[in-house]
């Protein structure tokens, strides 16, 4: 199906683009790219190539660069275009805008000024990694890129150590080995993790194991491509049934079964389903 020009209401359209395979884009996203008055991109070459692949004519339209290095200078100009009643389509270099992406300040300013901000959802490396990584997805925390320096990286990992959900990071091939070493040291060598690289591309690979095992793999291999790292939540194996029952009993004094299960699962790191089943049984036994 060829993209078609459609009538768009004035505003800012945040368009998710493929993270690897060019066909991983929605029909709606293609229609928006075919119809917007002005195209804005983190990487103009990537957007132009995507449009060429899908047969979207650029015509006389502008393709304006908006990235970390020029955002402060470009925002007033883009806000001026919105003020004129134009439609702007913004695309990340890859994936969903706002996720480790420079478009946040633009979207926030547009919304604060009263302009319509619309999402055309689609690919995301975070969600794709969670889908194939083999770690719990009921709760997760996306932390973006860790600091480059080992000391700062360890400090950040300590802050994340107690978060009751799967940790999600972006990392570069040059730093993945050092990150794994620091994560094993700070979070413990036995925590399970996954390294997901080149997602949706020809050489997609998911490496699973403990942090210690993955540290060894990274020391022996030179991993290439874009990388997402998943690390499981802190182990809850030391939570005994009696302790869990006590926590649930306290929570149930002022909460519904569902809310109590949510609160205790978040506190202990246990799977919500397991906690909910126990809470339900306790409620029925009363």
Give the label of every model feature segment:
Residues 1-67:
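Glycine-rich, flexible N-terminal cofactor/catalytic loop recognition
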Residues 33-39, 114-118, 166-167:
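Short active-site oxyanion
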Residues 75-124:
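Glycine/small-residue-rich loop that forms an oxyanion/phosphate-binding "nest" at active or ligand-binding sites
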Residues 41, 117-122, 169, 195:
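General beta-strand structural signal in soluble alpha/beta enzymes
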Residues 2, 105-163:
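Class I SAM-dependent methyltransferase SAM-binding "motif I" and its flanking Rossmann-like core
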Residues 64-72, 146-149:
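Conserved helicase motor
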Residues 51-52, 67-80:
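Short, structured surface patches at the beginning of a domain
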